[in-house]
C-alpha cells in the first residue's frame, strides 16, 4: 500500500491537472502520476519516508496555480470595476481596509527576498487560510444574486477551488523542507459577511469591490513569495 503522504501528493497533482491549463509536458507527467505510473526516483528533501514526488514538481505546480489565481483575481477585479464601478467612488472606501491589512508581510519583493523561508511559508499558508471564508461567501452570494456577470462567478469559483489545492500543496512543501515546523502565523478572521449580503446595493457592491481589491493584492503577494521560495529550494 502506498504511503499516505504519497497518496495525498498524487491526489493533489491529479486535482491540479483536472482544473488547470498547464503546459503539455507538465500535463503528460501529471497524467502519468494520476494513472499510478511512478517513474520518479525517491526524492524527499529533508523528509524521511518513501516519497516519490520531487520537490521541484511540487514547487512547479504551486507556482503555476498561484500565478493563475493572481491572473484570475486581476481579471475578476477589473471586470467588476468595469461593470459596477462607473460613477462610484469605491477606491476611497476600501483604502487600508483589507481583512489581512494587519498581517506583518514584506513591503516589497526585495524585503521578501530577505525574509527567511520559514517565515515566508508561514505567511503564504496564513494568507491562503484567511481567504477560505471570504471566497466561500462570495461564491454563495454571487450564485443567489442577479446582476453579476457569469464570468465573475466562474472566476470566483475557480479561485476558491484552486486556493484549497494551493494550500494543500504549500503545506506539503512546508513539511518537506521543514519537517519539524509546527507553528504557523495566526490568520485574520474575515467579518464582512453582513455587508456582502446586505440588501442595500451600494453597501453590497462596496463589499465586493473591497474583497476583489484585497484578493488581487494578496494573490500577488502569494505568487511572489512562492516564486521566491521555489528559487531557494530548486533551480529557477
From Swiss-Prot:
Gene3D superfamilies: 1.20.1250.10. The keyword Disulfide bond applies. InterPro entries: 4_helix_cytokine-like_core, Somatotropin/Prolactin, Somatotropin_CS. GO terms for molecular function: hormone activity; prolactin receptor binding. Keywords: Disulfide bond, Glycoprotein, Hormone, Secreted, Signal. GO terms for cellular component: extracellular space. It holds the Pfam family Hormone_1. This is Chorionic somatomammotropin hormone 1.
Amino acid at each position: 500500500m502506498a504511503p499516505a503522504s504519497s497518496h495525498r501528493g498524487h491526489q493533489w497533482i491529479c486535482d491540479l491537472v483536472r482544473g488547470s491549463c498547464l503546459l503539455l509536458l507538465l500535463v503528460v507527467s501529471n497524467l502519468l502520476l494520476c494513472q499510478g505510473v511512478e517513474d520518479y526516483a525517491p526524492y524527499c528533501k529533508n523528509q524521511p519516508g518513501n516519497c516519490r514526488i520531487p520537490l521541484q514538481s511540487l514547487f512547479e505546480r504551486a507556482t503555476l496555480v498561484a500565478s493563475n489565481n493572481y491572473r484570475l483575481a486581476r481579471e475578476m477585479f477589473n471586470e467588476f470595476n468595469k461593470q459596477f464601478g462607473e460613477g462610484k467612488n469605491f477606491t476611497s472606501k476600501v483604502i487600508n481596509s483589507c481583512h489581512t491589512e494587519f498581517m506583518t508581510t514584506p513591503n516589497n519583493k526585495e524585503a521578501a527576498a530577505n525574509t527567511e523561508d520559514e517565515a515566508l511559508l508561514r505567511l503564504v499558508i496564513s494568507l491562503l487560510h484567511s481567504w477560505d471564508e471570504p471566497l466561500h461567501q462570495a461564491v454563495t452570494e454571487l450564485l443567489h444574486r442577479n446582476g453579476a456577470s457569469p464570468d465573475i462567478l466562474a472566476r470566483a469559483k475557480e479561485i476558491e477551488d484552486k486556493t484549497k489545492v494551493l494550500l494543500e500543496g504549500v503545506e506539503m512543501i512546508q513539511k518537506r523542507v521543514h519537517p519539524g515546523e509546527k507553528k504557523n502565523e495566526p490568520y485574520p478572521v474575515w467579518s464582512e459577511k453582513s455587508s456582502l449580503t446586505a440588501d442595500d446595493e451600494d453597501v453590497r457592491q462596496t463589499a465586493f469591490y473591497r474583497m476583489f481589491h484585497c484578493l488581487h493584492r494578496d494573490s500577488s503577494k502569494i505568487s511572489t513569495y512562492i516564486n521566491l521560495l521555489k528559487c531557494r529550494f530548486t533551480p529557477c
